[in-house]
């Protein structure tokens, strides 16, 4: 009889201890939410294929088709298109700021747009307003020129030297 009481006491103590452990390990009630284990880095937008940073530049340029930079371009920054996503909540985007020589930019325009690189100086200035361009401050770009793509835009400063390649997408 003593053995059965001892077994009962051990079983009861073990059960109580397990119940307490379970309660402690689940400190969140039913209504609480726990942070997602797959939280995105601050430089990656929801639905975007990769973070917006220099380390992922090649992956970003490979999105869609035909994205590249002028020959010999130096990339100054790669940032997420934050303002664009305010206008298009399911969208994501990248802003690639670069510098390149005048001849390289002209050749790039001729090869990658429907415009001639030789005539872009005569084209009118672009104006803000398109949601694809909402991340750029046009007050800081002299004589901006723009060419649109199906999934982005190219904005150049004149005289030529600085540019921004914008790549946009949607998680739909």
Description of each model-found segment:
Residues 8-9:
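N-terminal export leaders
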Residues 1-4:
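N-terminal secretory signal peptides that target proteins for export/translocation
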Residues 20-23:
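C-terminal motif of bacterial Sec signal peptides marking the signal peptidase cleavage site
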Residues 95, 105-172:
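Extracytosolic low-complexity repeat regions of secreted or lipid-anchored proteins
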Residues 30-96, 100-101:
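Extracytoplasmic low-complexity, Pro/Thr/Ser/Ala/Gly-rich segments
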Residues 25-27:
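Bacterial signal peptide processing site
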């Amino acid at each position: 009889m003593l053995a059965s009481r001892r077994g009962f006491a051990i079983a009861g103590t073990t059960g109580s201890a397990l119940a307490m452990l379970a309660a402690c390990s689940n400190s969140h009630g039913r209504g609480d939410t726990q942070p997602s284990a797959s939280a995105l880095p601050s430089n990656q937008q929801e639905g975007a294929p990769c973070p917006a940073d220099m380390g992922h530049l090649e992956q970003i340029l490979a999105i869609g088709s035909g994205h590249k930079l002028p020959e010999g371009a130096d990339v100054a920054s790669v940032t997420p298109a934050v303002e664009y996503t305010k206008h298009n909540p399911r969208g994501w985007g990248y802003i690639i700021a670069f510098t390149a020589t005048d001849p390289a930019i002209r050749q790039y325009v001729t090869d990658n747009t429907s415009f001639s690189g030789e005539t872009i100086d005569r084209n009118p200035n672009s104006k803000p307003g398109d949601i694809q361009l909402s991340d750029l401050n046009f007050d800081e770009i002299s004589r901006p020129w723009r060419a649109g793509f199906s999934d982005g835009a190219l904005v150049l400063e004149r005289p030529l030297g600085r540019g921004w390649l914008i790549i946009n997408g949607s998680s739909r």
